[in-house]
Design a protein with these regions (language model features):
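Aliphatic-rich helix starts adjacent to a transmembrane/signal segment
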Residues: 2-4, 12, 16-80
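Broad, structure-driven detector of short, well-ordered beta-strand segments within folded domains
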Residues: 107, 147-156, 181
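Sequence contexts marking disulfide-bonded cysteines in secreted/extracellular proteins
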Residues: 2, 133-135, 254
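Short linear sequence signals and composition-biased patches located at protein termini or domain-edge surfaces
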Residues: 45, 53-57, 61-64, 74-76, ...
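Short consensus segments that form the blades of beta-propeller domains
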Residues: 137-143, 236
Length: 255
């Protein structure tokens, strides 16, 4: 039998083996597990970033609010003429009685319908002396001027506002829930404009008599902010900050 007559062998076909269904399911499960882990890490990173942003914003709002209040409240009853002795008669002439304020009185507070303090602070400035009202504006009129600053809370928009000399209220900061004020007085004296002592008790506006309103040495302000992290477990709905401001006019300081 010659070669041409011999039976021809068919080539061996190698069978290509794919993944079984079980292997595919395991691979998909592992991939989903890894993807879930990545998403959790991403969500945690995003939430941490939001928390840090919210806290930073809260700190900025607290700092701005207290800085403005400090600058203005310390000037309550201030007048530009230096004097060694507190000038009772002169101050009464420079700051005449108006509305609820007595002659010479530089600060006054009352509650609004929601229990928030409406704080009025007035002082005198000379043109170009650099003293700022609550809106951050100096006196550039070319003459002496009185600034009446009225702080209040916009309960609808949760904003601390201020109006100057009867003008419109301007929003200063956001996320304010409430503002309370206590007034530091010397309970042992009823002499008007007595700057010989120091505050020994803090009272609400309703507890102050007319004599006390002319003898306020310091003011304790508490601003309660809406907590940006309030939705997280264990976090309070609000956060309160308290500061005490001394009145320069009560200690004979002329800026």
């Amino acid at each position: 039998m010659n070669e041409s007559q011999m039976p021809r062998r068919l080539p061996i076909r190698h069978r290509v083996r794919g993944y079984s269904l079980i292997e595919l399911m395991i691979a998909i499960a592992v991939a989903l597990f890894l993807l879930a882990g990545i998403l959790l890490i991403e969500e945690g990173t995003h939430q941490t970033s939001l928390n840090q942003t919210g806290l930073a914003q809260l700190q900025d709002e607290e700092r701005v609010a207290m800085t403005i209040l400090s600058n203005v409240v310390q000037l309550a009853g201030y007048y530009p003429t230096p004097a060694a002795v507190f000038p009772k008669n002169e101050l009464e002439l420079l700051l005449p009685a108006v509305g609820a304020l007595q002659a010479g009185q530089g600060i006054y507070g009352q509650k609004d319908a929601n229990g928030n303090e409406v704080l009025t602070v007035r002082f005198l400035t000379n043109s170009g002396d650099g003293l700022l009202n609550c809106l951050g504006n100096p006196n550039t009129t070319g003459a002496s001027s009185e600034y009446d600053n009225v702080f209040a809370v916009d309960n609808v928009n949760h904003q601390l506002t201020c109006a100057v000399n009867g003008g419109p209220a301007v929003a200063l900061i956001n996320n304010v829930q409430s503002v309370t004020v206590l007034y530091g007085v010397n309970s042992t004296t009823t002499t008007r404009f007595d700057n010989s002592g120091a505050a020994d008790v803090y009272l609400t506006a309703n507890q102050l008599t007319s004599d006390f309103w002319t003898n306020i040495y310091s003011v304790k302000v508490t601003i309660t902010f809406i907590n940006p992290l309030a939705k997280q477990p264990g976090q309070p709905a609000t956060i309160a900050f308290t500061r005490v401001f001394g009145l320069k006019s009560r200690v004979g300081v002329n800026v």
